């Protein structure tokens, strides 16, 4: 299910975006899935947790619109995982002594959010997402770096205004 915003195709809900990225973590970001919607406390839960081949925990925060709130969320989750011990078997491949990968994915980031991210988390990966239709009619979820270079993309199939994952 798609919507159009500022001339871009986007998934209609954050839940669809999250599910699609979760199911395609490896081809999109070279991460293995660890946990989705991990409860930090009653008010906070991390969207997606993954682990890279070196055992670093990746904390992903997704926004269907502007990524303004994602930086503070990533900071809270980084603090939580840095302090807590995790006996959950989902975390067995994670080396908590290694620096975490913090990734914010949104349809766009305004300049103040980008400046704030660079100040607070110098190595935070800020990625934009969009669904792009190519000339051959195929749709792809595209993740781009801030300089507009494509980091990764993966095919999706749209049938009768619905999203079919392939």
Which residues does each predicted region cover?
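Charged, terminal alpha-helix-loop-beta segments
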Residues: 1-166
